[in-house]
Amino acid sequence: MLIKKYTSDWIKNFEYLKLEIDKGLSGIDYLIEHIGSTSITNLDSKPIIDIDIIYENESEFGKIKSGLIKIGYYYNGNQGVEKRDVFKRNGISITGTLDSIIHHLYVCPRNSKALERHILSRNFLRNNDWARLEYQEMKYELAEKANQNKKLYAELKELNVNEFIDSIIEKEKRTTTSKKTSKT
């Protein structure tokens, strides 16, 4: 099965990955966020940990890139998404953790639209059971349509889920804005 039942192991796996990445980026100013479906409690998902490394100043990117290369990643460009750089494992095992836990690693500046999209959709799905359940149902339906084929599933998801994600992002923006307004 392409979609797996939720497990708290995904949160633990993120923490293990974060620990190893932190070792490679020691002395650099950044944040690490667990994003994507595996970051949302009780959301069934493909068992792939999605991670965003976030930096404030442009000068930090080169340092982050060098640190990631030292711990066995290679730079894979932005893959067509502005202000979201992709890093992949190079096959040289320096640490078992980074090679044994399947993950996607992105590096984004704080002002990245891709980062905003990741964080807002994650937060909304974490806080709204109805949206989580609807999204989960879509994922199962698409996996079935794709005959459990990963590549076809990704294509179908891109075509069929963006409208839903866009709508929950707008709802989360309104929620975030109203919370900020009520504090002032």
Tell what function each PLM region has.
Residues 111-184:
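Catalytic cores of NTP-dependent nucleotidyl/adenyl transfer enzymes across multiple folds
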Residues 2-8, 52-53, 121-125:
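Short histidine-centered catalytic/ligand-binding loop motif
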Residues 73-112:
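Conserved catalytic core of two-metal-ion nucleotidyltransferases
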Residues 1-33, 162, 173:
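Helical scaffold of the NTase/Pol beta-like nucleotidyltransferase catalytic core
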Residues 63-71:
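Short amphipathic alpha-helices in soluble, non-transmembrane regions
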Residues 1-4, 44-47, 145:
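A short, surface-exposed helix-loop junction/capping segment
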Residues 29-30, 72-74:
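Short glycine-aromatic motifs
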Residues 21-62:
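Active-site nucleotide-donor binding segment shared across nucleotidyl transfer reactions
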